[in-house]
From Swiss-Prot:
Record region (Disordered): 1-42, 71-110, 388-419, 731-800, 841-960, 983-1034
Top-level division of the source organism's lineage: Eukaryota
One term under GO cellular component: chromatin
Enzyme class: hydrolase
Biased composition annotated in UniProt, kind: Acidic residues: 74-85
Function statement: Insertion mutation in SMT4 confers temperature and benomyl sensitivity; high copy suppressor of a temperature sensitive mutation in MIF2.
UniProt-listed GO biological process terms: chromosome condensation; mitotic spindle assembly checkpoint signaling; plasmid maintenance; protein desumoylation; proteolysis
Name this protein carries in UniProt: Ubiquitin-like-specific protease 2
Keyword Phosphoprotein: yes
Gene for this chain: ULP2
Length: 1034
């Protein structure tokens, strides 16, 4: 034998006995080096030699017939291209002479390289011969330690939800077989996946593989908590599982799984249970049967499956978009729920197929046969909240978080208002009267106390009380001083913005006795659109100090050391996290005006800064008031620290800021905030009751409470009755005479909502109206309204009794038709439409047909009448007015006369009227404009036009006295002259007579003094011309 050593690692054994080099060992020196005249070996050959060296020196295994049969089955499941793959295929041991000092040399094809085999197969396995191999096992019979690396996809099944969680790819499985036991570990990014080490003998109960060598499922004996890193956002989650799944994506890895399968079948077939199925779908079905054995399913189990199926469908919506990758069997890797309603649960390892067998027993969902009562259905204690539903968590929670986790449902219970039980408000009597140390007192009634139940809106009384209560508590603890803080009422901001023209004037009286710029903190609760938020104004005292020491600051600035003006900070906090820049602008305007008025400080708007401060967000739309109370309480527990937290929140990230704010403001304790506030009030009430009993005032206070509650109930019933009040108008017609009496009740004052453009037509002809300037205009000119200051008094509803006389030119049938067509001015056609179509003027007498043919309508724009006050001096009352009214009552109507009756007051009706009065006043009703015309006597038709002027001048003295007395009486009795009645004969030409008495005269119902009419004044210059009387709206 040659003295040269054999190289077993990378070179073939050399036959030095038969070679030429053996005869002349020294001849190698004369030969040229081979590196210059030979080619380098092919890398594949080098790799083949390197891999074959380990295999050749392994001992040959001897196995029984059963093991041989299983290996034959496993070899036959590969395609025909693998037929030459077998160990020792195409080679024989007889080709080489065995050496006593070395194992037998074994040749194998290139296809079998790099498979990491841990054992050597005998050449007689294929023919099933029991003859042992030529080379037996090594004396010690041990197996050399070997490691095998597989690249693929790792998944596991959650034991609770039966969901498959796929680890982020790629993962590496390291299979190791040593002298102890076979085991494997999983790696990701060169680090071991937590708790993924598995010992096959100790931990594994069953291993299932497919014949394609692309899929392997390992069922563990016990649960293991495995840390999975998911595809979405690299989020990690710990999963309790006993099913591990390994799949491959490349053909190269399949042969390594095949090697593991062979090793398990031949070496550990008795200690490890191994099953080989045809394809992956059968493995999945096998896993389903292992988890849920086939049995008669109860209705409750079917219902649970139905719920899980629904959740699985929504869970699939939350997954990241599917990524498809092709492999040998062209199956896309799709992550889906494990136990879904699809025939093949794991689409990540199989092809997409159409659902063809939904009617199978394992896929059908049976309807529970048990009857459920409505009370049990709607009043279950275990009802899950809306927040726990998968759809509700699409944006709010971790996508892969278990939605059926009871801890998760409890954590979000604050968002579920629908399932909260109704709270019965406790009776809070007597009302709490609490007086603080600064002298201010607050009262909390039973109605206020109810606001703290059932997530009701907190009213102003509760908010004002508790903000004051917690500020006083901080003062008592010496956290702040009383002179450093000022609390505004919750109505301050509402009053501030009541008139946008001048904000400061709206609340000037509220702050006259305050010194706001000496306060360090000014708290202003704000309510806008039924939402509470608050702001705290700081640094006002620094502004005042700066301007008071302005001379010193100027001296410092002259030495080239500048001192900037301090800034006023308005710290605004809203539990809905809204910004309120516009709402804070009125407060800025108020501070500027207040500083100028109170301290003569010119404050610029740029010196006032609003800062939005983060606070915990409210979970509903009703707890804003509670959050304002708690935020103010937390602020005054440590104002400096709270301001620092708000300053630092601008620097931190948004996520970190939310966690820091929620922790600082104790958001978790706000679920019981209403209960704590109620408890505080009950304790204060107990102290108050003990004080009342000590002073012997308890019984008296309770009686007052009962009386007050009784009055409130009565008022509520009264208000309910008032809601059904209707305006009813009655029209009484008399067939005996041609007179109609209308009774209506207009509202007490004209509504501001009535448009000023509304006009009521009045049909007059040649009517004469006196203007305030003394001029007389006809009806074809626009009358000038007399202006007078309006009074602020509001008159109660007044009952108007209006007499409408028959027109001398309208027949009885026509008058009746007009009365039937009459409707109220508030609900239909105005009453003036039903008046006489023509009133004879003073210019020329006309006949019936002429009067009817010459009628025309004149629009009188007087929606808001006003009185005329003629003079400052009120004349003395004359007896002419009294005799005029009484005489009108007793006079009988004459066929040739027209009776004109003025209804003033009840006193006028009782006093009587002088029948010798030469003239009577013609009054034309202006209805809803309340403008009355008091005309002079209507002349005889036979007289000429120029006689009218002479008669008017001759009666100036007598008529002037009458009008002066009317002026005084109208001012004293506060009456309105509303209507004019004309009594006309049925035949002949109309004329006036001072001595005639009309039995047909209709009197107007008197206005009572209790109606408290606004004053009327008469504009008079002693003339007998018509006078304009106007009523002023209250």
């Amino acid at each position: 034998m040659s003295a040269r050593k054999r190289k077993f690692n990378s070179l073939k054994p050399l036959d030095t006995l038969n070679s030429s080099r053996a005869s002349s060992p020294r001849s190698s020196a004369s030969l040229p080096p081979k590196r210059y005249n030979t080619f380098r070996k092919d890398p594949k050959i080098v790799d083949h030699l390197n891999n074959a060296s380990t295999k050749d020196f392994l001992p040959v295994l001897s196995m029984n017939s059963e093991s041989k049969r299983q290996i034959e089955l496993s070899d036959n499941d590969v395609d025909n291209n693998d037929e030459g793959e077998g160990v020792n295929s195409g080679c024989s041991d007889q080709d080489f002479e065995p050496l006593q000092s070395s194992p037998l040399k074994r040749h194998s094809s290139l296809k079998s390289t790099s498979n990491g085999l841990l054992f050597q197969m005998s050449n007689n396995l294929g023919n099933g011969s029991p003859e042992p191999a030529v080379a037996s096992t090594s004396p010690n019979g041990s197996i050399i330690s070997t490691k095998l690396n597989l690249n693929g996809q790792f998944s596991c099944v959650d034991s609770k939800t039966l969901r498959i969680y796929r680890h982020k790819a790629p993962c590496i499985m390291t299979f190791v077989s040593d002298h102890n036991h076979p085991k494997f570990s999983l790696y990701f990014q060169q680090s071991v996946i937590y708790n993924s080490q598995v010992n096959l003998l100790d931990d594994v109960e069953l291993i299932i593989l497919d014949k394609k060598n692309s899929f392997m499922a390992i069922i563990l004996k016990d649960l293991k908590k495995v840390k999975m890193i998911l595809d979405v956002n690299n989020s990690s989650i710990n999963i309790n599982t006993n099913i591990l799944i390994w799949s491959t994506a490349s053909s190269a890895s399949n042969k390594k799984i095949k090697s593991i399968k062979r090793f398990l079948l031949m070496s550990y077939s008795s200690s490890i249970k191994v099953e080989i199925l045809d394809h992956k779908e059968q493995i999945l079905e096998r896993l389903k049967h292992l988890i849920h054995p086939i049995s008669s399913s109860s209705p409750s189990l079917n219902m649970e499956r139905a719920i899980n199926s629904t959740k699985n469908a929504f869970d699939s919506l939350r997954l990241k978009k599917t990524k498809l990758s092709t492999n040998d069997d062209e199956s896309p890797q799709i992550h889906t729920h494990f136990l879904s309603n699809k025939p093949h649960g794991l689409q990540s390892l199989t092809k997409r197929t159409r659902i063809a067998s939904l009617g199978k027993k394992e896929h059908s969902i049976s309807v529970p046969k048990s009857n459920i009562s409505p009370s049990d259905f709607y009043n279950t204690n275990g009802t899950e909240t809306l927040q726990s539903h998968a759809v509700s968590q699409l944006r709010r929670s971790n996508r892969f978080k278990d939605v059926s986790d009871p801890a998760n449902s409890n954590s979000n219970s604050e968002f579920d208002d629908a399932t909260t039980e109704f709270e019965t408000p406790e009776l809070f009597k007597p009302s709490l009267c609490y007086k603080f140390n600064d002298g201010s007192s607050y009262t909390i009634t039973n109605q206020d106390f109810k606001c703290l139940f059932n997530k009701d809106w907190v009213n102003d009384s509760i908010l004002d009380f508790f903000t004051k209560f917690y500020i006083e508590s901080s003062i008592e603890k010496s956290i702040i001083k009383r002179e450093q803080v000022h609390l505004m009422s919750s109505f301050f901001y509402t009053k501030l913005i009541s008139n946008p023209a001048d904000y400061y004037s709206n609340v000037k009286k509220w702050v006259n006795n305050t010194d706001l710029f000496s306060k360090k903190y000014v708290v202003i609760p704000i309510n806008i659109s039924y939402h509470w938020f608050s702001c705290i104004i700081t640094n006002l005292d620094a502004i005042l100090d700066f301007h008071q020491n302005k001379d010193k600051n100027d001296a410092i600035n002259s030495d080239e050391i500048s001192i900037n003006n301090p800034l006023v900070n308005i710290l605004t906090f809203d539990s809905l996290r809204q910004t309120h820049s516009r709402e804070i602008d009125p407060i800025k305007e108020f501070l500027i005006s207040y500083a100028l008025d109170k301290y003569s400080i010119q404050l610029d708007k740029t010196q006032i800064k609003m800062k939005t401060c983060p606070v915990p967000q409210q979970p509903n739309m009703s707890d804003c008031g509670v959050h304002v109370i708690l935020n103010i309480r937390k602020f005054f527990e440590n104002p400096v620290e709270t301001i620092d937290v708000w300053k630092n929140s601008k620097i931190k990230s948004k996520h970190f800021t939310a966690k820091m704010i929620n922790k600082y403001f104790d958001k978790n304790e706000r679920n019981s905030a209403r209960k704590n506030l109620r408890h505080t009030l009950k304790l204060l009430q107990l102290n108050y009751i003990s004080y009342l009993k000590k002073e012997n005032l308890y019984e008296e206070v309770m009686q007052m409470e009962e009386k007050k509650s009784t009055n409130i109930n009565n008022n509520e019933n009264y208000d309910d009755d008032d809601e059904e009040i209707q305006i009813i108008e009655n029209i009484d017609q008399s067939s005996k005479d041609n007179n109609a009496q209308l009774t209506s009740e207009p509202p007490c004052s004209r509504s501001s909502s009535i448009s000023t453009t509304e006009r009521e037509p009045t049909e007059l002809h040649n009517s004469v109206v006196r203007q305030p300037t003394g001029e007389i205009i006809t009806d074809n000119e626009d009358p000038v309204r007399a202006a007078s200051p309006e009074t602020a008094s509001v008159s109660p509803p007044i009952r108007h009794n209006i007499l409408k006389s028959s027109s001398p030119f309208i027949s009885e049938s026509a008058n009746e038709t007009e009365q039937e067509e009459f409707t109220s001015p508030y609900f239909g056609r105005p009453s003036l439409k039903t008046r006489a179509k023509q009133f004879e003027g003073v210019s020329s007498p006309i006949k019936n047909d002429q009067a009817l043919s010459s009628t025309h309508d004149i629009m009188m724009p007087s929606p808001k009448p006003k009185r005329i006050y003629p003079s400052k001096k009120i004349p003395q009352l004359s007896s002419h007015v009294q005799s005029l009214s009484t005489d009108s009552m007793e006079r009988q109507s004459s066929p040739n006369n027209t009776n004109i009756v003025i209804s003033d007051t009840e006193q006028d009706s009782r006093l009587g009227v002088n029948s010798e009065s030469k003239n009577t006043s013609g009054i034309v009703n202006r209805d809803d404009s309340d403008v009355n015309l008091i005309g002079s006597s209507l002349p005889n038709v036979a007289e000429k036009n120029h006689d009218n002027t002479q008669e008017s001048n001759g009666n100036n003295d007598s008529l002037g006295k009458i009008l002066q007395n009317v002026d005084k009486e109208l001012n004293e009795k506060l009456v309105d002259i509303d209507d004019v009645a004309f009594s006309s004969p049925t035949r002949g030409i109309p004329r006036t007579s001072a001595t005639s008495k009309g039995s047909n005269a209709q009197l107007l119902s008197n206005y009572g003094d209790e109606n408290n009419q606004s004053q009327d004044s008469v504009w008079d210059e002693g003339r007998d011309n018509p006078i304009l009387l106007e009523d002023e709206d209250p």
